[in-house]
């Protein structure tokens, strides 16, 4: 009976240890996935920021060109 108790405790202990290891690996994997998601979000944010800056610059140049063309048209009409 004593051997049976020791065997049962050993099996339960080893099961608990393996469960603990699995939970730890699962947590590490979740942390890695979260970190990858954060990195992707940062990359997307940087891409959008760059695109919006370029779009703003293009819009500014287009606006200046349109104003210049309008001014030329007005000045030609007054001559």
From Swiss-Prot:
Q: Mark which residues the record calls propeptide.
A: 23-45
Give the tissue specificity: Expressed by the skin glands.
- Location relative to the cell: Secreted
Which superkingdom, per the lineage? Answer: Eukaryota
Q: Provide this UniProt record's keywords sorted from A to Z.
A: Amphibian defense peptide, Antibiotic, Antimicrobial, Antiviral protein, Fungicide, Immunity, Innate immunity, Secreted, Signal
What Gene Ontology cellular-component terms does the record carry? Answer: extracellular region
- Which cysteines does the record link by disulfide bonds? none
Endpoints of the signal sequence? 1-22
GO BP annotations listed: defense response to bacterium; defense response to fungus; innate immune response; killing of cells of another organism; regulation of defense response to virus
Main location (coarse class): secreted
What is the role of the protein in this entry? Antimicrobial activity with potent activity against Gram-positive and Gram-negative bacteria, fungi and protozoa. Also stimulates the microbicidal activity of polymorphonuclear leukocytes. Probably acts by disturbing membrane functions with its amphipathic structure. Does not show cytotoxicity on lymphocytes or KB cells. Does not show hemolytic activity. In vitro, shows spermicidal, antiviral, and anti-leishmanial activities.
Q: Which family does it belong to?
A: Belongs to the frog skin active peptide (FSAP) family. Dermaseptin subfamily.
Tell me the protein's name: Dermaseptin-S1
- The record lists the organism as Phyllomedusa sauvagei
């Amino acid at each position: 009976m004593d051997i049976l108790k020791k065997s049962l405790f050993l099996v339960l202990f080893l099961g608990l240890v393996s469960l603990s290891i699995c939970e730890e690996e699962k947590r590490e994997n979740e942390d890695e996935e979260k970190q990858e998601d954060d990195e992707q979000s940062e990359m997307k944010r940087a891409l959008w920021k760059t695109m919006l800056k370029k779009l703003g610059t293009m819009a500014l140049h287009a606006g200046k060109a349109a104003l210049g063309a309008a001014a030329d048209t007005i000045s030609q009409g007054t001559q």
